[in-house]
Amino acid sequence: MAKRVSLPDVVISAPKAVFKPAKEEALACILPKYYKSMADVSIKTNSVIDKCWFCNQDLVFRPISIETFKGGEVGYFCSKICRDSLASMVKSHVALREEPKISLLPLVFYEDKEKVINTINLLRDKDGVYGSCYFKENSQIIDISLRSLL
């Protein structure tokens, strides 16, 4: 049988099993001596809060943002379609909390931008929408395919 030992002078304030030291931000860029940095610029993010960052429509109600991995938010969007479309474009540069479910090309790709904006407005309040768009190179047509299980 094991003996119980009391240690009155020992205080365990943060056991190793519970305490995890906070990691500092990673270094942005370390170049070996044989590389020469050609550009090193830091720029604040866009501060426009009254227009959707994807479709440029006026935001007349509470905007939606992209959630980052560390719990922050970036961007202002009129719908989940716009939010997810931009998130799918920037996911290699911004650590996202969740994978985007919709991926549309930027509006500059489309000849009839109003058709795309009408689709965004039609599905703005729908939940469970997912899908993508497909570029047909031979006919220069973009097919938008958005679906829902609900």
Curated annotation (Swiss-Prot):
Molecular function as annotated in GO: zinc ion binding
InterPro entries in the cross-refs: Poxvirus_VLTF2, Znf_MYM
A family per Pfam: Pox_TAA1
Record function comment: Acts with RNA polymerase to initiate transcription from late gene promoters.
Family indicated by similarity: Belongs to the chordopoxvirinae VLTF-2 family.
SUBUNIT field: Interacts with itself. Interacts with the late transcription factors VLTF-1.
Entry protein name: Viral late gene transcription factor 2
Lineage, opening ranks: Viruses, Varidnaviria, Bamfordvirae, Nucleocytoviricota, Pokkesviricetes
